[in-house]
């Protein structure tokens, strides 16, 4: 399994150490083992290669943007099984990642993974987003919901000049969603991702 992870990371030109491969391997195995108990991901994608490509690699496609902006802290909203927050934290150990997850089941899983993978740069926040008072430079979200469902509440959690990085799919759908929220932000940028996954993947950057 580690060879599959190494191939996938190399195919996308990601830099990694062997310990990163070990952590990803253990992480995926834990998801497979505990998925039914914690309701982490769709059963249709609950095999090793699907998790690796559709979740791990997809999450890593945003890492270069995080490093380019270089915030001191990142808030990952609705972390679920830990995508993208856990993955970004594994490969970006010098930065603090806050993973916000309201589900007790999923946050329990995240706390287990944090300890097992020894992720000292991760903190799990188990509550509704409306209860968060801290302001952040950088917020990530990887959700199937339309951006107009969360744009305003996330904007209010941004520091001045901060941004939201939303993982999104097809460009046509993005255009429709952007038109609904364009007046909320000073600038909106869409970045096409260089994915080998044969699916349309884009990042939408929403600047306060």
From Swiss-Prot:
Q: Which residues bind S-adenosyl-L-methionine?
A: 78, 83, 101-103, 129-130, 142
Localization of this protein? Cytoplasm
**What are the protein's GO molecular function terms?**
rRNA (guanine-N7-)-methyltransferase activity
- Please state the Enzyme Commission number of this protein: 2.1.1.-
Keywords from the UniProt entry: Cytoplasm, Methyltransferase, rRNA processing, S-adenosyl-L-methionine, Transferase
One GO cellular component assignment for this chain's record is: cytosol
UniProt-listed SUPFAM superfamilies: S-adenosyl-L-methionine-dependent methyltransferases (SSF53335)
Where mainly located? cytoplasm
Similarity annotation? Belongs to the methyltransferase superfamily. RNA methyltransferase RsmG family.
Give the protein's biological function: Specifically methylates the N7 position of a guanine in 16S rRNA.
| NCBIfam families for the chain | rsmG_gidB
Q: What PANTHER family does the record point to? A: S-ADENOSYL-L-METHIONINE-DEPENDENT METHYLTRANSFERASES SUPERFAMILY PROTEIN (PTHR31760:SF0)
**Annotated protein name in UniProt:** Ribosomal RNA small subunit methyltransferase G
What organism does the UniProt record list as the source? Borreliella burgdorferi (strain ZS7)
Q: Which gene encodes it?
A: rsmG
């Amino acid at each position: 399994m580690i060879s599959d992870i190494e191939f996938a990371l190399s195919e996308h030109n990601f830099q990694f150490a062997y310990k990163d491969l070990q952590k990803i391997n253990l992480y995926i195995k834990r998801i497979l083992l505990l998925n039914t108990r914690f309701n982490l991901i769709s059963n249709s994608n609950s095999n090793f290669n699907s998790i690796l490509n559709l979740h791990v690699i997809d999450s890593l496609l945003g890492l270069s943007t995080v490093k380019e902006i270089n915030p001191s802290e990142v808030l990952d909203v609705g972390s679920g099984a830990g995508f993208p927050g856990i993955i970004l934290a594994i490969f970006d150990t010098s930065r603090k990642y806050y993973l916000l997850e309201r589900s007790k089941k999923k946050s329990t899983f995240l706390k287990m993974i944090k300890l097992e993978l020894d992720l000292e740069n991760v903190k799990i926040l188990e509550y509704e987003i409306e209860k968060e008072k801290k302001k952040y430079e950088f917020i990530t979200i990887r959700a199937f919901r339309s951006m107009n469902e969360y744009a305003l509440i996330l904007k209010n959690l941004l520091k001045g000049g901060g941004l939201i990085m939303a993982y999104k799919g097809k460009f046509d759908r993005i255009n429709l969603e952007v038109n609904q929220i364009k007046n909320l932000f000073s600038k909106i940028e869409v970045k096409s991702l260089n994915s080998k996954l044969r699916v349309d993947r884009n990042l939408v950057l929403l600047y306060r």
